[in-house]
Amino acid sequence: PVPSLLRGFSAPVNLRFDFTDADLTHLMTYDADAFNRWEAGQRLALNFLLRGIVDFRAGRASRFPDAFVRAFGWVLADAPKDPAFATEALGLPSEGYIAEQMGEIDPDAIHSVRRSLRKHIATALRNELLAAYRTTKAPQPYRPDAHSAGQRALRNLCLGYLMELDEPRIRALCIAQFDTADNMTDSM
């Protein structure tokens, strides 16, 4: 069993618990508590990014386990239920946050490894990201409600990952979205 700690707890707490990567993958995929799913995904991604930075500095290629990508795919498949949550859960830790976790900050390594992970996810989940992008088109005309905002955010996140592939077809999707945008979120 994998404990899902502090479920439903609303106060800021900094609890250290040594979960294995397998535990974090399990929580990211199956935990019923949305915050714990997000937190597990962030911790798991940070673990792989920090290891990737060590590899990068040593001149080795970064390795990102398939189980992590499958967990991302699971969250993406579940995205129609709550696109705003999926957007948060599928986002990687920021370069600034990664730097805060390091003793010696290496901006080039952080940027390179984070981008490598984004490309790895995009390559492995290309079809799923494309499907999510196509099915989350916000209703026309523009509506400023929470559900529509979540759909726009998820759609843009998917497009951001897909742009890592540097394919003409994906660039065309990006340009078409910009050209037809009726709101600032979709044009940025």
Residue ranges of predicted features:
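Long, ordered, helix-rich scaffold segments
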Residues: 1-188
